[in-house]
Amino acid sequence: MEKALPSIAAPDLEITLVEKQSELLPTQGFADELRDQVREQLKELNIRLIEGSELAYLPPFNVGELGRFVVETKDGHRIEADMWFQCYGARPNTGYVAGTELQSAVRPDGALKVEPTLQVVGQTNIYAIGDVTDVRESKRADAARAQARIVISNISSQLSGKEPQATYNPSDEWVILPLGPEHGASQLLDSQGNSRILGPDQTAEIKGADLMVSVIRSQLNLP
């Protein structure tokens, strides 16, 4: 979605987003109200959104390479453009475990299979957290931090001669999605775990100014 941001800095650019799924932000758990907010703001920014379709063929230029071309989606939408970006097909970067004892824990999609304790399946003293795991949730920094706390607890138990007891339970989905410094929408969880939707003003206040770089710097004790 952030690929749409150049239209804010350079309003003369024509941006088209093609979403293969039937609706944008298809992750289970995201509210329709969130999607509606994002759709409306993309419209305000004159960004063309095509949902429920995909390119019938790839452009004749490499990703990020400048060159005029015309493509069509499988359901007939015509797109003229000068550059394209592939924002799909992410795969966990686990190639480095090939040929090691962890190879048997790698799923066909590249993710590492982990136990609820976050131990790699088949291993006692090897843990995995973050994007490489097969934990069924969106891959977020806060989720990786929460997983790290579970691993710390379990390693501490093992160092004390005890069995790992702490288990990781994915939280409900949430997202803070800025569309430039003044637009965006968010789905957050209140103290009771209920979802609430924030509009552009609140989203910009939380993340729009610096993409929360200052918050992360503070957490890491960086200047």
Where are these regions (language model features)?
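C-terminal, flexible cofactor-proximal segment of oxidoreductases
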Residues: S138, Q147-P223
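A conserved short coil-to-beta-strand element within the FAD-binding core of flavoproteins
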Residues: E51-L66
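Glycine-centered tight beta-turn/hairpin loop motif at sheet-sheet or coil-to-beta transitions
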Residues: K74-G76
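Hydrophobic/aromatic beta-strand patches that form the interior of the parallel beta-sheet core
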Residues: T16-V18, I50, F85, Y127-I129, ...
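FAD-site-proximal beta/loop scaffold in flavoenzymes
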Residues: R78-A146
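Alpha-helix termini
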Residues: E2-A10, F61-G64, Q158-P164
